[in-house]
């Protein structure tokens, strides 16, 4: 028998109607409109001061005036404690129970106290408040601006020329499972260039190429082909090179079946283990006369040269820490676009730990005081970065400044390398023609087959690499001319007018105008002269080496005292310019050709430092620069015009004061960003001027440089302005030819990158060098301004990984707000409503706290790091290489705005992501409704009775078996990421079912359960990207028929809480409210999750899964406490509830 109140006979709408017996049309729009008539009538009677009607209605109501029992999400009746207290914030007729639950209390039915019954408002999950909408639009707008800037502004020009080759590969089948357990998965090949290499015998120096993440063994072909052609066409005909120990290179390459090493640490270790055995096998080939064709007088090779691309460079460094590493088998490593400083992504715990082990080993090795204690003393490491065009791995991560001292390695950008002068993307660095030529020639230059290591000593190797990869203008550049022997005997007439007056500039607009060989002698100022003199020379003509017969040669000469009957046969080259005069002077001269610096040609017709396929080849400028102390032992600089016919070409040479050509602008970064910086080069200026701006260090900012036009007073310009921007460390230079405007960006101090072994001085910053025509007697005005729109694009590469962490910061705060409201009012509000509430208080307070935290750590950092700069060998055991790992990866107060900026972007992303999830669940719900079959002969009433149940709880045994099988698979065969993906799919289906019930049978309980499952689904989706990479690696291993069980990620505890929680939600159980202090546990867990995601999430993203897993563990426990909070409630997780489920209303 039904129980009715005098005010209304409608039952509580908060109690869900049972799905199996639900009448979906009962709550249709039509019925809800008709049920509104009694309320309207009551209101009308009340306004007319007439007694209300006491007639009893059989229709359902929104409120049951006495509700001794409440129902959960599946309709199960839950007994509630009887003690009650009135809630001050509850509406009339609502009371708060002892455990914090809102209930209705019985109201005395008198004509004066009759209150019309109203249905609780339906809270649509699609609804969004104006403030949340504005925040989402601002966030998405800023994200679009960042993406648009990254593809349209501050872009480096693409200048790679195409390369060609004729490759062939010989598989070394004898390297099988007898040598390594991984031989069934990986393969070793020997590269051979067709038409050049006649067989597969090894006869040269072994070089091992290691492909990168998902790379192919065939990527070795551009560099290997260039090496084969260069030796065949040039080196084998160079007797001096052959005598110096140069031989051809035998390139070995490894087929890793395109393994994904960036996402899986164990794969990285497996490759390193395999390669160590491969190196041992490769070295053994040179001992086997059947496959080796070498001079028996040469020593057997004991080491290989390693060339690594991308993650292959990390694998190369990992080889040296593996137990099966053969000592001294690797002493030269060249890497291209390899992320040495930190992992490209931090989704895998083993990857992060492997990186830490590798980097700690290298730092510890180079921190040893004595060479005998350093296992890496003979190892050189050169890291080559592609620059701004590399959008796969941030080039900031290629830095090795925090790993090796400059005596053993360095980082250089391709835009710095002479005759390359262009940025490259992640793949182009392998096939770029001008770059591969430099790499091949540099390797040949360090080869010496007369040594067992097959390479020159470490110091000589470093000297060679600096010569090939650096500009030659760095402070560490070594000048070769002062250390060489005199090679040229120059004889000049004493009465010649070829001596330039001291202090004057030599300017030649054309060569060979005298019709004979002519020498211009420039006196060298004495060492220690005031002004710190330096000599500079610029020409568009190639400088001759001793014995060559070109157009121009530069010599440093000393007067030879006249002695009777002295022999001059010791000079390989002699030039007599005395014309038979009796009064002549002989000079012993050294050639400056070894120290020539190549600069990109800058004329009125050039646009880029490089030329492309099909374009006319551009001859670079030749530049010399010496401090007076470097050439103080000589008396003259001789500029010799060797051509006797008029030839186009210019020469500008001068001695200038260092103080006139160098200046430092001490301007704060804030002032520069606000007002810009202006300076001018005076009319009477040196040919080369340099301006250093110490405040320009951040890689997050971009600038625009503008140079005014110079007036040459009618004379033709010798050359157009040439600008070089450069950093001292890492070695990054960019050239701008025919410069009028230039876009300036750099790879300096970058987020999340460890500090260098030797702390950077405050004076280190971006520098600009200007080569301008000094014959143009007009000043040049230069302006440097910040490019704010261009700077937005720099955030993309540096902060794209924040989307693995900061959205969880937002989601955790929203979930926390939803639970707090639910425990207080009994309403589990939708996700967007929770987001709106968080935007009003929680998120701003949290962002303010995080900003203050970053500011405080930035203030304390300098004092704690002061000891970094005083270390005996360049590093320190107390140096904190992880202090940039937190929050936004930088302690610069200028970038504190990035914290709220990233948060507002994540608010927009979370909003869009939420709507995408809503769309997905609704579409799946519609599809599920369409596939539901209802025969046409079934009437409407019967069709309502046949509505399928939303939640059928399987038997406890079946649920336990399913869970046990899944966990058993995790323990033995599949990674736990697979189980997590299954859990996400199950949760999606649960959310779809909850959405169908909530939309068809609108009630508070159904709405609560749907909003709860939807929010849990959103949380799991944001955790999913952290788990997907490992799952992809596992699928890839299956695809390559590698059936060995996955050797990592089998911890069932890492996924069991999620499985239990998702299984519980499939039964339709709503999480119970907690009115005691235990509700603060959920709040603290979600608060801690939000803080952890913001502070540590970017660097340790893999830990976010564990944090969310612990939250799922707690929620599963709360689910087990449906009746009371006790451990006995745990049995409810897998107990059948069909017996206690009510099919309709209680009689």
UniProtKB/Swiss-Prot annotation:
The chain crosses the membrane at residues 127-147, 795-815, 843-863, 893-913, 918-938, 965-985, 1015-1035, 1052-1072, 1084-1104. It is found in: Endoplasmic reticulum membrane. Keywords: Endoplasmic reticulum, Glycoprotein, Hydrolase, Membrane, Protein transport, Transmembrane, Transmembrane helix, Transport. Signal peptide: none annotated. Residues 28-49 have a biased composition (Basic and acidic residues). Residues 1-94 are annotated as: Disordered. Involved in inositol deacylation of GPI-anchored proteins which plays important roles in the quality control and ER-associated degradation of GPI-anchored proteins. This is GPI inositol-deacylase. The gene is BST1.
